[in-house]
Amino acid sequence: MSDELLTSVLTPNMLKGLTYRETALRVFSVLLSDFTKTELAEGIERAYADNFASVAVTPVTRVGDEFLLELHHGPTSAFKDVALCMLPQLMSAALKDTGRRVMIATATSGDTGKAALSGFMNVPGIGITVFYPHGKVSDIQYLQMATQEGRNVAVAAVEGNFDDVQSTVKKIFASDLRQELADEGVQLSSANSINIGRLVPQVVYYFDAYRQLVEANEVEQGAKVDFCVPTGNFGDVLAGYYAYRMGLPVRHFIVASNANNVLTDFLTTGVYDRNRPFVKTITPSMDILISSNLERMLYYASEGDTALIARLMENLRNEGVFRVEGEMLERIRSLFKCGWADDAETSAMIREAWRKDGRLVDPHTAVALKVARERADRSVPCVVLSTASPFKFCRDVYIALTGRPLEGDPDGFAYMDALSGLTGENAPAPLAGLRSMPVLHKDVVRPEGMADFIRAAAARAF
């Protein structure tokens, strides 16, 4: 992304009175200048007109002293929908009349996979393969992917954790398979945040959240706010950082982590060290030790010192650790704050949000809410990103509220029904409907078998 595009080119005042879709058009017109305004407007209409349960797309609501930016009203009930309803529109526009085809290879820790499968299902000229860590996503997340229909989709579980899956996908992009597919007229691409087209749509909801706060008289135009973001891969908070560089008034981005708190340690000490035990938590989408998007922020924090960033990333690959010091670290720490929560603290916040505030939140949102409420300086409003429906993680939310599992610890649908009965809230229709859908994808592969799986998927798709 061009440095020049990220220098105070948008101000909140320019977005006053706009709808979400109008705000998206303003942001995309700046960041995606290779597309015509008509292409962007038509893509935005297809992405956001009917796919979201809320007219606001990403509404902001109050929970206690904080605000929730609700990002889970899309077709798969996760924040990835905001980007992955738009990315297929962008890729289709780019491919139009070219005769080119694209094979997407995507790693997921839970939410990206289903959102990408849903967004790209049966899109002409595009095939998609999704890999997730075997046994390390929730029951509902698994079923969302395993039941996915579409003539151009393929799904496989991978033995290992998300870091194993993600690092292998990255290696595949630098492997002979990329050229092999290119020789057949197929471009290898990604729906992960390594694809900048995945991040750009997420910039929009930061600007739109601020607009909503101003219009609700919760913040004065131009006044700074905090955003607290639950993240493992640093992608969602990076989108906010892009918005900040474009002109959004932000005091701090608060990076909220689970027990895999490598980002907390880095922002506290300047040392990024992935040489630690991998912890399986009730926030599986954050069970990550290699935050692939951190590199992009470091580039700006180093004032574009590409040689330094290359050395840091080489150290991470070879030794599993790198260190940032001096003025660069101070620049980072002046904007990015941090905190983390273990599973017990996460469950406690789920209970607190329900009993005290009457809000049912998923575990990832609970991590961020807990960290936000521990801010040392609460003098400015704080927007907490609510990244998924609690019904995607109904077992863990139910146990957090009741203190015990159901008798026999049954499948996710029993917990979905029990959570609905306990709280009086209904699961989103796409999640509730999973129980009647057949499992279509049962493949389990080792990391070294992922390239062959993509090769076979491309042969079927095209």
What residue spans do the PLM features occupy?
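PLP-dependent amino-acid enzyme catalytic core
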Residues: S2-F462
